[in-house]
Amino acid sequence: MNDDIIILLSVFCGIFFICFIICSSIALYLWKSKSRKRLVEQYTKEAKQAKKQILANGYKEISEAKMLFLKRSELEKNELDRVKEQLELRSNDLKRNQEIVESKSQRLDASLLDLEKRKFLLDKKEEYLIKILEDASGLTKSQAKELLIKQVKNKSEKELISILKNAELQAHSSSKMIANNIIISAMERIKVELTSQRTTNIVKLPSDDLKGRIIGKDGRNMKAFEQIGGVDIVVDETPNTVVVSSFNPIRREIATRTLEQLIIDGRIQPIKIENELKKQEQELEYIIQETGLSTIKELNINDIDIELVKLIGKLKFRTSYGQNVLAHSIEVAKLSGAIASELGLDVEKAIRAGLLHDIGKAIDFEKQGSHVVLGAEIAKKYNEDPIIINCIESHHEDKEKESEIAAIVAIADSISASRPGARYNAIDEFILRMTEIEKIGNSIPGVAKTYALQSGRQIRLIVNPLVASDLDLAMILEKMKEEIKNKVIIPGEITITVIRERKETDVLK
């Protein structure tokens, strides 16, 4: 019995659970159906509202477009009316002008008819008068015409010749005056310093006691200056003064700076002299470059190779007929620029050509060839303008001048060289003689350096110990004596010294 009740309860619970699930499912379905319906109704409502909004916006845009169209149409109509009115006015003006032209044309036609009648009458009168003149003179019309032309021609030729002669004289006088004015104006604008070339530098001493130290034991220090520096050290009775003498201004400047530095340092001995000479040589190279840079800055020259700048600076230590070449080149540059300015030519190019016209003199004592040829080679090497190159080649008439600037540079060069006090031939001849001696010595095989001292009366030949032996010294000496006799004239006795010295240096650690 209990079992049956339990079974019935179990069945009843199962049926109840199944019914509950079914009812829950139906309820859930109905709820979802209502939710969907509400969503559909909401979406439908929103769609209707959007449709109304779109239609409203469309009507508004159509209305605005219609209004805009009407306004444009009205404006265009007004513009057309205005144009039409202007055309009508112009048409009326044209009609009036046409009437005026027609009236004038009629008057002109009448005037032409009147003129033709008058011309006909004048022609008749002219024929009548010509006939009377022919009868009176016994000449026909053509004969009288030829006679008149001949007389007028002779008179005109005489007058023309007179006019041409006067014009030629006036042009010659005027051109000469203009040329003089241009050159005078250019020279007035240039400030020139008058300088004379020296072959000695004076070194001031704080005390005469230093003279003995400068000479050194057995004159070793002075010999070091002569052999290594290529200069003469002159120690005389002049108080507190030592003279550095050399025709080569670069060597003289290096030796002067070396001696001044050694005096400050206090240690004066051959090794110190040699080291200081090398140091001052390097410093002088820097000074040469700075001189070149300051020169191109002074003349406002741009875009120039640094090696060419160094050569310009080197001209400071080169002379020609006693005239400093750098000062001469700057003077020629300024004169060329001033003349070019007066003539309306390229001033910058004229200044550049004037500065570089003697650039070959920076190396003519080191290489074979004239300064003109060497200068042109330098200009070509550093890509200078062809006009500049021609100025260098033609300033001594070696080549034909190809531009006005070339002629200007040649004129400026002549003015600079010919002014009073600019050049002194004696010292230049002396320098040429000394240079020739050194060239002869350096051309002998085995000779490393040659120094001409004491106006050429003392010649030092420094032999390369790796090339020439002690046995070769006599041969080198004889060769030098023979060359000097044949090529150089020096009055008095000449002492030639051949020096072969070899040093071995090592560092012990």
UniProtKB/Swiss-Prot annotation:
Its main location: membrane. One of its GO terms (cellular component) is plasma membrane. It comes from the Bacteria. GO terms for molecular function: RNA binding; RNA endonuclease activity. GO terms for biological process: mRNA catabolic process. It holds the Pfam family KH_1. Gene3D superfamilies: Hypothetical protein af1432 (1.10.3210.10), K Homology domain, type 1 (3.30.1370.10). Residues 199-259 form the KH domain. It is a single-pass membrane protein. It is found in: Cell membrane. The chain crosses the membrane at residues 5-25. Residues 325-418 form the HD domain. Keywords: Cell membrane, Endonuclease, Hydrolase, Membrane, Nuclease, RNA-binding, Transmembrane, Transmembrane helix. It is an enzyme of class 3 (hydrolase). Its EC number is 3.1.-.-. Endoribonuclease that initiates mRNA decay. Belongs to the RNase Y family. This is Ribonuclease Y. The gene is rny.
